[in-house]
Amino acid sequence: MNRPVGTPNFDGSFVVPAEVDTDDVDNFELGWKTTLLDNQLRFNGAAFFIDISDLQTTIFDPSIVNLFFSDNAADAEVIGVEGDITYAPEAFQGLTINGAFSILDSEITEVLTPTGDVVEGDELAFAPTFQGNLRARYEWDVKSNALGEDLVGHIQPSIVYSSASNSDILQFNTDRVQGYTQVGLALGVSSDNWSGEIYANNLFNSSGELSRAFGNDRQRVTPVRPRTIGARVAYNFR
């Protein structure tokens, strides 16, 4: 129930509704799972179309009322493809490459709230056009240690990327969420019972943002974690 129910905008073309309708989402998806190159390559994925009707949102528009209210603001569509890949080449024993990606094309197709706060053709909030990650792990045998255990060493570089996106569908609330690229590196050794690893996440200390939100006249930003260097040790008490 909206507290400022019945409040009109300046020309009377819009009145804050007493309640909002349930938004509806229809999702159509075609997926696949494949194994190629004599089981060296696995590629799974899906293509999808999402039809959103009566998208709910919370609006703060001082030209109408100095209170937040909810409304069915727009209809929208999302077309996308996502997938994950694992490649373990026989010609390079010990190497495994993993990756995943997401491609989105989102759009406001019809504006339902005649206040000018939502614009047809804009993308949806927090819907980056492309996101992806890639990780390569190489393992090799290490000579037995003083306890007579056979050890396995590994090195694992990785990269994560996200393009920029909008923080809201409302014009006066929205801001651009900064995209980012992060590189990581890990080096370690393991046996049947224990493992140890040193790692560096966001190796080059790149900037970026996970989210933005507007509240109390301020943009509140959640940044990506800065460069983090650490060590992990695990033991299996079996």
Where are the language model's segments positioned?
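Flexible, solvent-exposed coil segments and beta strand-coil junctions
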Residues: 1-13, 23-26, 57-67, 108-117, ...
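C-terminal beta-barrel architecture of Gram-negative outer-membrane proteins
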Residues: 2-13, 126-190, 201-204, 214-217
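Extracellular loop and loop/strand-boundary signature of outer-membrane beta-barrel proteins
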Residues: 13-19, 66-72, 115-124, 169-174, ...
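Repeated loop/turn-to-beta-strand initiation elements of outer-membrane beta-barrel proteins
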Residues: 38-43, 92-97, 143-146, 193-198
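Gram-negative outer-membrane beta-barrel transporters
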Residues: 49-51, 71-166, 232-238
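C-terminal beta-signal and adjacent terminal beta-strands/loops
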Residues: 51, 160-168, 188-238
